[in-house]
Regions:
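Extended, charge-enriched "interface" segments that sit outside catalytic cores
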Residues: 1-81, 85
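Charged, amphipathic alpha-helical interaction segments
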Residues: 63, 67-68, 130, 150, ...
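Short coil/turn segments at secondary-structure boundaries
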Residues: 26-31, 69-79, 108-110, 137-142, ...
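Glycine-rich, Trp-frequent "lid" loop and neighboring beta-strands that shape
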Residues: 115, 156-208
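Internal helix-loop-helix
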Residues: 59-60, 90-159, 163, 167
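Glycine- and acidic
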Residues: 40-51, 75-80, 104-111, 123-132, ...
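Conserved beta-strand/loop block within the catalytic cores
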Residues: 83, 88-96, 187-193
């Protein structure tokens, strides 16, 4: 069977980079999870093998599910049903396949249900998914938006949202500025916290 990871050995160039050892040590916090989680690596070599296994699973799904589904997704497309947007039926099949494989929340800590992988192998997985279906990659890679909440959100917010993203249950990017569209560089809206009002004030133009 085809595999969009193992069929392209050049991908391993990134994992073999000398800086990866330091990247892994930082992400794994010197392998502090090894006594807490069965799937946590015990050293650098173990971590790299973990990443390769995840990439191999990604490559298998990409070649044998995502790519074969891509034409049907394009032909059916998303559509409105009673005022709600629905993906093409094969898109839901793709989401379920990646969800069942545990390919959501890849970079999130294990305590939230993630795989705690660095951005480098996550980006490799994203490229593999895009090779099969660039449109689905845009949906699947929305999971990295949760990095912002992880870095700046409260623990209560993390506990509420991150496990759901790691389970493949939710994630979206909603742009409502008339001149921005999918171009994030053109977003002009500013959010300013008002101490007097005790809330965030949005300054700009939004269209819903």
């Amino acid at each position: 069977m085809a595999n969009y990871y193992s069929d392209h050995p050049e991908f391993d160039f990134y994992l073999n980079h000398p800086e990866m050892k330091r990247v892994v040590e930082l992400k794994e916090r010197n392998f502090a999870d090894k006594d807490k989680y069965e799937d946590a690596p015990v050293d650098f070599d173990d971590a790299i093998e973990n990443y390769k296994r995840v990439l191999d699973i990604t490559g298998d799904i990409a070649a044998n599910i995502l790519e074969p589904n891509s034409e049907a997704v394009d032909l059916e497309g998303p559509h409105l049903v009673e005022g709600r947007m629905h993906y093409a039926s094969k898109t839901y099949e793709n989401i379920e396949a990646t969800r069942q494989a545990g390919l959501w929340g890849i970079s999130m800590p294990r305590r939230y249900g993630g795989l705690n992988m660095p951005i480098t192998p996550y980006s490799m997985a994203s490229e593999i998914v895009a090779t099969a279906d660039a449109g689905f990659q845009n949906i699947w890679s929305l999971q990295d938006c949760i990095e912002t909440l992880y870095e700046f959100g409260s623990e209560e917010q993390r506990q509420k949202y991150i496990p759901r993203v790691c389970a493949g249950e939710t994630m979206s990017m909603d742009l409502t500025e008339p001149d921005a569209g999918s171009d994030l560089q053109r977003v002009m809206l500013k959010a300013t916290y008002s101490e007097e009002e005790g809330c965030w004030l949005l300054n700009g133009v939004k269209r819903f």
